[in-house]
Amino acid sequence: MCRKQPFLLPTLLGILAALMLQQGPVEAFGGSRLCKTGFLEDVYHASVYRSVHEGQPLLNVMFTDCGTDRRIQYETSNPTDFRIDGDGIVFASRTFDISPEQAEFLVYAQDEDTRELWHVTVKITLRPPHEHHSHQGFHKVREIKFSTQRNSNGLQRQKRDWVIPPINVPENARGTFPQELVRIRSDRDKNLSLRYSVTGPGADQPPIGVFIINPIGGQLSVTKPLDREQIANFHLRAHAVDVNGNQVENPIDIVINVIDMNDNRPEFLHQIWNGSIPEGSKPGTYVMTVTAIDGDDPKQPNGMLRYKILSQTPAISSPNMFTINNETGDIITLAAGLDREKVQRYTLIIQATDMEGNPTYGLSNTATAVIAVTDVNDNPPEFTAMTFYGEVPENRVDVVVANLTVTDKDQPHTPAWNAVYRIVGGDGTGRFAIKTDANSNDGLVTVVKPIDYETKSTYILTVVAENQVDLIRGIQFKPESTATVSVTVIDVNENPYFTPNPKLIRQEEGLFASKMLTTFSAQDPDRYMQQTIRYSKLSDPANWLKIDPVNGLITTTAVLDRESMYVKNNMYNATFLATDSGIPPMSGTGTLQIYLLDINDNAPYVYPQEVEICERPDPNAINITALDADINPNSGPFIFELPYSPMDIKNWTVTRLSGDHAQLSLKIGSLDYGIYNIPIHITDSGNPAMSNTSYLRVKVCSCEHEYCSTTAPIIGTGLGTGAIIAILLCIIILLTLVLMFVVWMKRRDKERQAKQLLIDPEDDVRDNILKYDEEGGGEEDQDYDLSQLQQPDTMEPDTIKPVGIRRMDERPIHAEPQYPIRSAAPHPGDIGDFINEGLKAADNDPTAPPYDSLLVFDYEGSGSTAGSLSSLNSSSSGGEQDYDYLNDWGPRFKKLADMYGGSDD
């Protein structure tokens, strides 16, 4: 009994069922015969209704390659009506009614590598319209047997393993589950009670329970829809055991392939694709590749994609500017006319469709391709003017004299737009250069070498503008790419300059003052300004020279001396200044170098000038050298001689060793301790020669191990005049300082005594604490003790004052120093009259304000942070105040109340 199956299931599971209907199925797959490549049936049958729809599956033809993994391609003999996919499923190519003539056709299978060809016949049985059969076009469920064979001895031997064709199950199957796929049985089930089972992924391994088997009947079923994108195939093993669990058959392998269905829509890797192409590209130029993927089997039509362009925006130059390879997704140009100046960007809508691009039953998706038209140098730069003007002061460098402006239609800030300027004429000496401003693309004409107005006052430059990249082929430069620059040089006051500078002259030393040396003159480059030049001395270290301010004549002011400290390597340098009369005046410097020729003006002298020898010298000779400030030929070789005096000079002799060296030898064996001054007469080789007698100071000392240990007393020596004068000056200065100190001390004592005589003991406050809280006793200007003024020398001592009366600022009571008695005071009457007259005059003075009068202060402004101190103001009239409250103060204030109450009394 057959249960209802999905529409393709019986066909996919009927591989062996068809074989078992034929004679000897075992011979086809078992026994000694090997697997044969080809269709599993000679004729395939399908039962369908007359009317079919495009894409409707009709049946499945099975082809086996015996596991050799051949690449098989299928085709029908009537592709107009029927087509076949890579899994062997036959579909209707169009919607039509099948005629009897169309009900039979051939299916071809060809090896793509060897081109070997197989074919099989397909016969379609037309069903009546009222018939409803759940197994349309399919056979009954396949049955797979565990087959054995007995030999002549009655022993069983296992047959060779079967090659079981795969079981194909479509994914996403609908219907009632579980759905039976195949039946597994053994020939021994007639005699034994067997139990069947399956193992492997999908059965007892994850995912567990996808496939189940009836342990008694052997029906293998699938329990749920399959998804090829998750698992494309399952490898199971079928087992047969008896009720005791003993294996009665060897396991057989079962492969279940999940047949792909078109359940995945193509997906582009990017929703927006960006590409670029240079403008002016020829048709057929590659732009970019767009790619989409499909989750379905890429080897089947479900996963085979086809591309096409749905739209192009904008449709300028050509509505079909681009095309796409429908299989690879390569976008190429189809038409000419790409111009960035017209269209900078194209937007394409790309569609990818599976089922090999079938628009009816294929799934599709879209993406956007943005193609930027990149710039090429197809527009030369053009100057905005034919002539540009500029001016520059002479002798200025790194100055921009003119701005050159150009226009370029190419894309800004690209090599095709960036301008490069060149000077092609009018600047033979290379005094100008043109730099490009990176932002504005302007050309900056710059002076790179000084320009002399007196040499050339106007420059006419010819310049051209180009780009960083060459123009594309076929584009020529225009006349507007060349321009003229007129540069005017402005005359400025320039520095005078000496020529030659430095100036070298040769002169013998010893030239006296007021002698002319040379003329050192300067020139003014501003020959059109008619200016005068004046000269002055800038540097003359030895102050030997002066220069005439008008004509530059240099004369000496002192004797030139080659041996001066200011002369280096016989050369003396002086610097002079030349200043013109321009506004502002400009100046330049020049150096005069005087090479001084030597004359014999320096006598030679002995070196060293002091030596030490032992009293018994060994050797008894002293090496000496003659030095001369002059140079050859006015120096060596020298002549060394000893004079005839003093007498002890006879103990010595001198012998010349070379032109500059000699040896002073002692004729006797020893000398007494002391210091000996040996005169040596030396003559140079100058013409005329110069000679000099210099003294060699020889110190004779006691020696230990050939070194002096003690110094002998000085013989015939004493203090020099300079030393004696210095000692006397020191003594005089010391005595003067002592005398000045004594005088200052005496004067200070006298001043101290004079101060003590003038100080009154009563007024000597010093550092005592003053007490100022005594009040009363009348006015101090009237209450005074006249007796103190009359006889100050007879005032009472402090001891007779009452206790508590003595002021704190008075001296404490102790013995006071005795001072000389002052002269007698004037007559007391005179002092009293003087004081009384002054007091009377003060009292009668009408201009003197009384102490209790209202003081008037100057107005110092408002806004004091301390506020106003005059909070009580006088009323302008008596009626403005109410003084009735004074009557409530009692009888004591009655008089005050009467005064302010306005009473008539």
Swiss-Prot record:
<feature type="domain" description="Cadherin 5">
    <location>
        <begin position="605"/>
        <end position="713"/>
    </location>
</feature>
<dbReference type="GO" id="GO:0044331">
    <property type="term" value="P:cell-cell adhesion mediated by cadherin"/>
</dbReference>
<feature type="signal peptide">
    <location>
        <begin position="1"/>
        <end position="28"/>
    </location>
</feature>
<dbReference type="GO" id="GO:0007043">
    <property type="term" value="P:cell-cell junction assembly"/>
</dbReference>
<feature type="glycosylation site" description="N-linked (GlcNAc...) asparagine">
    <location>
        <position position="651"/>
    </location>
</feature>
<feature type="binding site">
    <location>
        <position position="229"/>
    </location>
    <ligand>
        <name>Ca(2+) 2</name>
    </ligand>
</feature>
<feature type="domain" description="Cadherin 4">
    <location>
        <begin position="499"/>
        <end position="604"/>
    </location>
</feature>
<feature type="glycosylation site" description="N-linked (GlcNAc...) asparagine">
    <location>
        <position position="326"/>
    </location>
</feature>
<dbReference type="InterPro" id="IPR039808">
    <property type="entry name" value="Cadherin"/>
</dbReference>
<feature type="glycosylation site" description="N-linked (GlcNAc...) asparagine">
    <location>
        <position position="623"/>
    </location>
</feature>
<dbReference type="InterPro" id="IPR014868">
    <property type="entry name" value="Cadherin_pro_dom"/>
</dbReference>
<keyword id="KW-1003">Cell membrane</keyword>
<feature type="glycosylation site" description="N-linked (GlcNAc...) asparagine">
    <location>
        <position position="191"/>
    </location>
</feature>
<feature type="binding site">
    <location>
        <position position="264"/>
    </location>
    <ligand>
        <name>Ca(2+) 3</name>
    </ligand>
</feature>
<keyword id="KW-1133">Transmembrane helix</keyword>
<feature type="transmembrane region" description="Helical">
    <location>
        <begin position="724"/>
        <end position="745"/>
    </location>
</feature>
<keyword id="KW-0677">Repeat</keyword>
<keyword id="KW-0130">Cell adhesion</keyword>
<dbReference type="GO" id="GO:0005737">
    <property type="term" value="C:cytoplasm"/>
</dbReference>
<feature type="glycosylation site" description="N-linked (GlcNAc...) asparagine">
    <location>
        <position position="573"/>
    </location>
</feature>
<dbReference type="GO" id="GO:0042383">
    <property type="term" value="C:sarcolemma"/>
</dbReference>
<comment type="function">
    <text>Calcium-dependent cell adhesion protein; preferentially mediates homotypic cell-cell adhesion. Cadherins may thus contribute to the sorting of heterogeneous cell types, and thereby play an important role during embryonic development. Required for proper neurite branching. Required for pre- and postsynaptic organization.</text>
</comment>
<dbReference type="InterPro" id="IPR002126">
    <property type="entry name" value="Cadherin-like_dom"/>
</dbReference>
<dbReference type="Pfam" id="PF00028">
    <property type="entry name" value="Cadherin"/>
</dbReference>
<dbReference type="GO" id="GO:0007156">
    <property type="term" value="P:homophilic cell adhesion via plasma membrane adhesion molecules"/>
</dbReference>
<dbReference type="GO" id="GO:0016477">
    <property type="term" value="P:cell migration"/>
</dbReference>
<dbReference type="GO" id="GO:0030027">
    <property type="term" value="C:lamellipodium"/>
</dbReference>
<dbReference type="GO" id="GO:0005509">
    <property type="term" value="F:calcium ion binding"/>
</dbReference>
<keyword id="KW-0732">Signal</keyword>
<feature type="binding site">
    <location>
        <position position="354"/>
    </location>
    <ligand>
        <name>Ca(2+) 3</name>
    </ligand>
</feature>
<dbReference type="GO" id="GO:0048787">
    <property type="term" value="C:presynaptic active zone membrane"/>
</dbReference>
<feature type="compositionally biased region" description="Low complexity">
    <location>
        <begin position="862"/>
        <end position="879"/>
    </location>
</feature>
<feature type="binding site">
    <location>
        <position position="171"/>
    </location>
    <ligand>
        <name>Ca(2+) 1</name>
    </ligand>
</feature>
<feature type="topological domain" description="Extracellular">
    <location>
        <begin position="161"/>
        <end position="723"/>
    </location>
</feature>
<dbReference type="GO" id="GO:0034332">
    <property type="term" value="P:adherens junction organization"/>
</dbReference>
<keyword id="KW-0965">Cell junction</keyword>
<feature type="glycosylation site" description="N-linked (GlcNAc...) asparagine">
    <location>
        <position position="274"/>
    </location>
</feature>
<comment type="subunit">
    <text>Homodimer (via extracellular region). Can also form heterodimers with other cadherins (via extracellular region). Dimerization occurs in trans, i.e. with a cadherin chain from another cell.</text>
</comment>
<dbReference type="GO" id="GO:0000902">
    <property type="term" value="P:cell morphogenesis"/>
</dbReference>
<feature type="topological domain" description="Cytoplasmic">
    <location>
        <begin position="746"/>
        <end position="905"/>
    </location>
</feature>
<dbReference type="InterPro" id="IPR020894">
    <property type="entry name" value="Cadherin_CS"/>
</dbReference>
<keyword id="KW-0472">Membrane</keyword>
